[in-house]
């Protein structure tokens, strides 16, 4: 199923998901720097593997994904299947609602 078929996302619920499942490795604030994973500020419309100052896997660079609602929705289901060889150890979010909520939060938090 695609993002177009996903339920409407709730940014507040998405923030909780981010804090429990993503924040140990990622930051969203402008200038917040990298952790285990890259800072996600300016994520939407950016190509995978291009954040300055972060050491990406060759897989993330070579995949050249343009991040947006549709690509994030597919990626967040199963990151290792979407980008084989990614360093991201996160297993993914199986529930469409959780993915929609996280994307709604990221749209606001990374803008």
Swiss-Prot record:
A GO BP entry: mitochondrial electron transport, cytochrome c to oxygen
Keywords of the record: Acetylation, Electron transport, Heme, Iron, Metal-binding, Methylation, Mitochondrion, Respiratory chain, Transport
Keyword Membrane: no
GO MF term list: electron transfer activity; heme binding; metal ion binding
Sites bearing N6,N6,N6-trimethyllysine, chain numbering: 80, 94
Residues binding heme c: 22, 25-26, 88
Pfam families tied to this protein: Cytochrom_C
A GO term from the CC aspect: mitochondrial intermembrane space
PTM characteristics: Binds 1 heme c group covalently per subunit.
Xref: PROSITE patterns: CYTC
Subcellular location: Mitochondrion intermembrane space
InterPro entries to which the protein is assigned, alphabetical: Cyt_c-like_dom, Cyt_c-like_dom_sf, Cyt_c_1A/1B
N-acetylalanine, modified sites: 1
PANTHER family hit by this protein: CYTOCHROME C
Family recorded in the similarity comment: Belongs to the cytochrome c family.
UniProt name for this protein: Cytochrome c
Protein's organism: Solanum lycopersicum
């Amino acid at each position: 199923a695609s993002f177009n078929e996903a339920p409407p996302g709730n940014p507040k619920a998405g923030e909780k998901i981010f804090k429990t499942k993503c924040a140990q490795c990622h930051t969203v604030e402008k200038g917040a720097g990298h952790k285990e994973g890259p800072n996600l500020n300016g994520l939407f419309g950016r190509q995978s593997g291009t954040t300055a100052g972060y050491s990406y896997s060759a897989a993330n660079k070579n995949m050249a994904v343009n991040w947006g609602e549709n690509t994030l929705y597919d990626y967040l289901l199963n990151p290792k299947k979407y980008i084989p060889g990614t360093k991201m150890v996160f297993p993914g979010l199986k529930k469409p609602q959780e993915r929609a909520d996280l994307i709604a939060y990221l749209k606001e938090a990374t803008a």
